[in-house]
Amino acid sequence: MKRKNNKFIEISIAFILGVALGIYGQNPDYFTNLINQKSLASSAPKIKHYNISELLRSKVSTCFTPPAGCTKFIANQIDRAEESIYMQAYGMSDALITTALINAQMRGVKVRILLDRSNLKQKFSKLHELQRAKIDVGIDKVPGIAHNKVIIIDRKKVITGSFNFTAAADKRNAENVIIIEDRELAESYLQNWLNRKASN
């Protein structure tokens, strides 16, 4: 009986090792990514609560597509920046927003951008154009996708929503943009930006 149990254990170990080696052979990064994902999942999310009555005293603006026009709405906000712009973006291919960011950099505004890694290969991404303009552009190497769509202006204004910074978001998709002018909220978003930057 003991010999049979030992044989069963040996077969089980061999089977598990076989599966593990098979997975590793097809995708050497599988276990590294799995560990990274588990470590991300195990760390508690940073949840911050806001008193709605306080936020209601903030200036809030919205924009929806269709019809087109949210790109110009966002670019106008960038044009008003005086000190700093921190951006997180999944898609970054819109010419008008790119021009507004470059112009901001040229007039002395500190512009810092974090993009999803897909921009390294996307044909229409403005990544290299932004870098040529001497803008600090980093890649967020989160195991999944960096799906944020956030712009923090002068540490007091947050632009966010479903809107990717692409022509498709403005002209083809149904999207939303919200702008909230609130220093405490902006600092919370900025801290997340800095945390993502530090982790890369």
From Swiss-Prot:
Record-level Gene Ontology MF annotations: phospholipase D activity; RNA endonuclease activity, producing 5'-phosphomonoesters
The keyword Cell inner membrane belongs to this UniProt entry's keyword annotation: no
Gene3D superfamilies to which the protein is assigned, alphabetical: Endonuclease Chain A
Residue intervals of the PLD phosphodiesterase domain: 142-169
EC number: 3.1.4.4
Keyword Hydrolase listed: yes
Superkingdom, natural source: Bacteria
CDD domains: PLDc_Nuc (cd09170)
Gene Ontology BP term (one): lipid catabolic process
Places the protein is found: Secreted
Annotated function: Could be a virulence factor.
Entry-linked PANTHER family: CARDIOLIPIN HYDROLASE, MITOCHONDRIAL CARDIOLIPIN HYDROLASE
Protein known as: Phospholipase D
